[in-house]
């Protein structure tokens, strides 16, 4: 696909005079364009759901979720991956974000990194990619060689693959087994795909990881019951989670959390089933960590 023919490289008539308007009008133009992004994502919800089901199946079988991207796309993958351990209590290596150019590229532009097909393959080899893993290639343009080569290599290994881009019929979409293509149109600043395209990608990644965690029993109701208390805010959140899930008071919630080494799931089962920590943990283990199953089946 030629660069000049890509939707993400097109000219947006709504912002053609943006350098001549007031600051407030400038903000309104950007905001009006941003409003279209969730609607673009809504149109691809069936594709997102299909990807979540595949990711969950692979992760349940011992695989990992691997994000692969360059520039903004790579940074978004790293952002999503880095939030999973504290939010859902998963091991750091379960969701991995890879960016063209390596760690230095998180804060700096690395010339030519996104054009390196070898880089995409090598980065996957360096994390010992296996057929159990799912590789999600992220590229607003859908033409990034680093991502395309990574997806090709992943498919050769037998991995399930997902391609996220904002141009229909892109190489990323056709290379991956599953394509998620929210069409957000031309950017306010021509070609600045960190804007609407980046926002769309962030929304999609939010759904992929959150959907995976919900289906993995990391959420009870709408509570993040595997959250790790790494700071005072999260310490308080744990107490509130146990309170909200059980109807107990703060003192009871804190006592249960202390008794089970601050594991929200165990504390919730302790309170709801009137069990000690060891028995509550045992029942959770018997049901794969799903609170709902412990409550419904016993």
Curated annotation (Swiss-Prot):
The active site is at 83 (proton donor), 114. InterPro entries: Etherase_MurQ, Glucokinase_regulatory_CS, MURQ/GCKR, SIS_dom, SIS_dom_sf. It holds the Pfam family GKRP_SIS_N. Pathway: Amino-sugar metabolism; 1,6-anhydro-N-acetylmuramate degradation; Amino-sugar metabolism; N-acetylmuramate degradation; Cell wall biogenesis; peptidoglycan recycling. Residues 55-218 form the SIS domain. Coiled coil: none annotated. Its EC number is 4.2.1.126. Induction: Induced by MurNAc 6-phosphate that releases the repressor MurR from the DNA. Repressed by MurR in the absence of MurNAc 6-phosphate. GO terms for molecular function: carbohydrate derivative binding; carbon-oxygen lyase activity; ether hydrolase activity. Keywords: Carbohydrate metabolism, Lyase. It catalyses: N-acetyl-D-muramate 6-phosphate + H2O = N-acetyl-D-glucosamine 6-phosphate + (R)-lactate. GO terms for biological process: 1,6-anhydro-N-acetyl-beta-muramic acid catabolic process; amino sugar catabolic process; N-acetylmuramic acid catabolic process; peptidoglycan turnover. A lyase-type mechanism (elimination/hydration) is suggested for the cleavage of the lactyl ether bond of MurNAc 6-phosphate, with the formation of an alpha,beta-unsaturated aldehyde intermediate with (E)-stereochemistry, followed by the syn addition of water to give product. NCBIfam families: N-acetylmuramic acid 6-phosphate etherase (TIGR00274), PRK05441.1 (NF003915), PRK12570.1 (NF009222). Belongs to the GCKR-like family. MurNAc-6-P etherase subfamily. Specifically catalyzes the cleavage of the D-lactyl ether substituent of MurNAc 6-phosphate, producing GlcNAc 6-phosphate and D-lactate. Together with AnmK, is also required for the utilization of anhydro-N-acetylmuramic acid (anhMurNAc) either imported from the medium or derived from its own cell wall murein, and thus plays a role in cell wall recycling. Homodimer. PANTHER family: GLUCOKINASE REGULATORY PROTEIN. This is N-acetylmuramic acid 6-phosphate etherase. The gene is murQ.
